Amino acid sequence: MAFLDNPLIILAHIRQSHVTSDDTGMCEMVLIDHDVDLEKLYQSSVSGENSTQMQSNGGETQGYVYSQSVDITSSWDFGIRRRSNTAQKLERLRKERQNQIKCKNVQWKDRNTSHSAEELSSLFERKNFKERALNQGKQSILSVRLEQCPLQLNNPFNEYSKFDGKGHVGTTATKKIDVYLSMQTSQDKLLPMTVVTIANAKVHDLIGLICWQYTTEGREPKLNDNVDAFCLHIAEDDGEVDTDFPPLDSNEPIHKFGFSTLALVEKYSSPGLAAKQSLFVRINAAHGFSLIQVDSTNVTMRDILEKALKRRKGSQRNSGPQYRLEKQSQPNVPVDLDSTLENQNSLEFCLVRENSSRGEEPPEEETQIDIATVQDMLSSHQYKSFKVSMIHRLRFTTDVQLGISGEKVEIDPVTNQKTSTKFWIKQKPISIDSDVLCACDLAEEKSPSHAMFKVTYLSNHDYKHLYFESDAATVNEIVLKVNYILESRASTARADYFAQKQRKLTRRTSFSFQKEKKPG
């Protein structure tokens, strides 16, 4: 331990001890006041003493003189490094270069040709700024809207304007949909109308909003005032209406459907749907009748005859007995097979075997069908879905949605099924084309609340069976609808199935007959 009584030495020692550890320089700031006072004190004392005393005290003052380091400056701007001259010069050159970019140099050239005074005056024409034309400002959007206000007051669909989502973008959930309008002309039909609706609106509300926007924009032709006369169909990106699917349910919310392109179609006068409607020709035979589906009246009678022969258990025209067609109203008068259906002026014909007349054939009971049955036959090709239960092995059932149309039968599993997850049964979607559909039969009917039916179809040269169950009314409706579709189509798979079934029945009958004959 050392005892020091010289303040200069103590200050120098503290400053040198903390100079390497204190980066902030606060050690110098704390002692700077005392340092200044001592400096003033020693300056006054040095001026009053002689030189001998200064030499004697030289050893003591030497510590104060060299107490301050050369690299340390006791000032308020400590720690700030001054910029070098080179950096300042480069900054100045950079600013000058930026200023030169903003300036444009134009080279002056003396004109070689002399221009007249008129030409010079036309180059720099004098304008009179005192006379200014009255500035007629552009009409504002508000003024245009106010002028169109009487038209909007007469809009019969004003009650659906509250579902317009153009003013709610960013605040409320909205949905943007491109709508094709089938009632417009061919040119305007190609361009969709963009509609923005709120997400919680129903399909019925969206139809009303489309009609409101259609009327507000002044489109032609004018729409029917009844919103129920229209429906929304799924549409392709080019505007083609997909009539294979039914229209959207008007009571469902629009956010349930993920389609961004729809088509507004009139329910009872849809050109897209009318083009797909088919005609049915009735062919009377010796043991019943059949309905032949044709696309148009331009089909030849030869094609109708071939379809009718295929319907008779797959028989062909060039094999077996030969047949001809006659009008039901004109017996024994063959129909020209090269003519079209349009030239016959009839949709009911009779299938007669060659070299025989209609009177020589076995008497046939007149089959009477009422109008309701004919309507059921014609409407059987329209799509309709049923909710039934599909029966698996070990009698496990799965709830599915059975969709039936004239082209195919679709089986889609219903989501969130507790039974399927419990027994590890995961039903996959199945699509059966009508050409490979063979039969639909009622399996059993125990009570009005429970019945079973079987669907048979051809898959990889093998006949497969699917069993379903539901209430008796639904099952009977499904079986009748599928059989109407099968009767109106010429399916080779169905004909082969019945032929194979007939052969098995014949073989079984002959075997039982031989078994009964042996004891005798």
From Swiss-Prot:
Region: SIN1-type RBD, residue numbers: 279-353
CDD domains: PH_Avo1
Domain SIN1-type PH: 382-487
UniProt keyword annotation of Signal present: no
Membrane topology: Peripheral membrane protein
Binding of a 1,2-diacyl-sn-glycero-3-phospho-(1D-myo-inositol-3,4,5-trisphosphate), residues: R393, K428, K464
Any one GO BP annotation for this protein: TORC2 signaling
Start and end residues of each stretch annotated as Disordered: 310-333
Domain notes: The CRIM domain forms a ubiquitin-like fold with a characteristic acidic loop, which recognizes and binds AGC protein kinase family members substrates.
Protein name as annotated: Target of rapamycin complex 2 subunit MAPKAP1
Native source species: Xenopus tropicalis (Western clawed frog)
Origin organism lineage: Eukaryota, Metazoa, Chordata, Craniata, Vertebrata
Gene giving rise to this polypeptide: mapkap1
